[in-house]
Amino acid sequence: MALGLAAKKEIVAEVSEVASQALSVAVAEYRGMEVSELTELRVKAREQGVYLKVVRNTLAKRALSETKFSDLESALTGPLIYGFSIEAPGGAARLFKDFAKTNAKLNVTALSIGSGLLGPEKLDAVAALPTRDEALARLLATFKAPVGKFVQTVNEIPSKFVRVLAAIKETK
C-alpha cells in the first residue's frame, strides 16, 4: 500500500523527533528475517529502551538530514531497520550485537554517535559504552579510591605500632 504525502510527512516528523532526542543510532540490514524474528527483536528493544523503526530510506534521509546523525545518509541502502538509543549511548548497538549472535541475517551496516559515521567494525566499541548508571558508578569509584587509600594509610600507623609491641612481647 502506497503512503500518501501526509503519512510520509508524519513518519519524517516522528523519526526526526526521535533522532533529535537519541544519543546514538545503529542501522542494520534485516534481509531474509522472518516476522517472528523481527517481533522478538522489537520486544527486546522495548525492554532495553531502544526505539526501533523500519522506514523507507528516502524518508529516513529526510528525517535525519536536520539532526546530528545526518552523516548516516551515505550508508542508507537496502532494507534497513533503525535503532535509536534513547537511554544509553550503546543501547541500540548492544541490542543488535546480542541479537546478531542468534540470528545471522541481521547485519549492522552503520553506526553513529553524533560525531561521524562509524562502520560495522566499531560495533563492539559502541556496544561497550557504559549506561548512565555505570558511568556514574565508575566516576564515584574514582572519587572514592584516594580517600579510601588515605584512610587505610592513616590506619596502618597504629596497627604497625601494635604489631611491633606484640613482636617485642613475644621475644621477652
UniProtKB/Swiss-Prot annotation:
It comes from the Bacteria. Disulfide bonds: none annotated. GO terms for cellular component: ribonucleoprotein complex; ribosome. InterPro entries: Ribosomal_uL10, Ribosomal_uL10-like_sf, Ribosomal_uL10_bac, Ribosomal_uL10_bac_type. GO terms for molecular function: large ribosomal subunit rRNA binding. The keyword Ribosomal protein applies. SUPFAM superfamilies: Ribosomal protein L10-like. GO terms for biological process: translation. Keywords: Ribonucleoprotein, Ribosomal protein, RNA-binding, rRNA-binding. Belongs to the universal ribosomal protein uL10 family. Part of the ribosomal stalk of the 50S ribosomal subunit. The N-terminus interacts with L11 and the large rRNA to form the base of the stalk. The C-terminus forms an elongated spine to which L12 dimers bind in a sequential fashion forming a multimeric L10(L12)X complex. Forms part of the ribosomal stalk, playing a central role in the interaction of the ribosome with GTP-bound translation factors. This is Large ribosomal subunit protein uL10.
